[in-house]
């Protein structure tokens, strides 16, 4: 087997983070009386940009990051930030669904003998809901709450490798995001796989080892290595 361990970004790689937040934010826009809101994707991209700025500051629990990100987006758009919005966005995230390929592909990867590990920018009580949605056992889960830091901090991947007790070149990190995942995993010496679900052109400044449109590519890789 080529990679004894596969580590995964969760939201955006295994779970439809983009669609989930896009739908939530578009519904918030309409409920706020925004007569000409941009598409959900545009709102989600702005939400992500605000969030990325916040997670690079002093560590705060992810639920607080979500609430502050939404509050700032509401301020920008002229929407009211209402009582209950902070809890509503956390509740929405807990219900985000896996991509159609996620469960069956992960079952194949696990059946091939590869250990499955999640490394996620979230809180423990949020990821626990998502794990129930995934329905596939994971050997370990590391969240930002465990480390006191968020990806793309190099500390996240240093602690991950320490936790795994494996040489970095024997660990494959699977993710859709370059700035959060592929770049810092490469710096840590891990092998990397880009899940390019939207068939986007690759950035020219970050190297990676594999590229697939979905997780079926990973399943084939580990099965062929047996």
Where are these regions (language model features)?
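Asp-based, Mg2+/Mn2+-dependent phosphohydrolase catalytic module
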Residues: 1-4, 18, 38, 80, ...
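N-terminal helical cap/lid subdomain that shapes the substrate entry/recognition surface
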Residues: 1-103, 111-112
């Amino acid at each position: 087997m080529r990679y004894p361990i596969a580590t995964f970004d969760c939201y955006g790689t295994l779970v439809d983070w983009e669609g989930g937040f896009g739908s939530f934010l578009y519904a918030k826009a309409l409920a706020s009386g925004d007569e000409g809101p941009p598409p959900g994707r545009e709102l989600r991209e702005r939400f992500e940009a605000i969030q990325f700025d916040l997670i690079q500051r002093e560590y705060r629990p992810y639920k607080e990051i979500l609430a502050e990100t939404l509050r700032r987006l509401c301020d920008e758009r002229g929407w009211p930030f209402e009582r209950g919005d902070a809890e509503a966005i956390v509740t929405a995230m807990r219900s985000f669904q896996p991509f159609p390929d996620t469960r069956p592909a992960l079952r194949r990867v696990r059946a091939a003998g590869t250990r499955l590990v999640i490394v996620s920018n979230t809180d423990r009580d949020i990821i626990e809901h998502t794990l129930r949605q995934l329905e596939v056992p994971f050997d370990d889960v590391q969240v930002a709450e465990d480390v006191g830091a968020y990806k793309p901090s190099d500390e996240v991947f240093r602690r991950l490798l320490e936790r795994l007790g494996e040489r970095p070149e024997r660990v494959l990190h699977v993710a859709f995001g370059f700035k959060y995942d592929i770049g810092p995993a490469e710096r840590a010496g891990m092998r990397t796989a880009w899940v390019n679900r939207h068939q986007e052109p690759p950035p020219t400044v970050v190297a990676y080892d594999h590229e697939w449109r979905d997780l079926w590519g990973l399943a084939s890789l580990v099965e062929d290595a047996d």
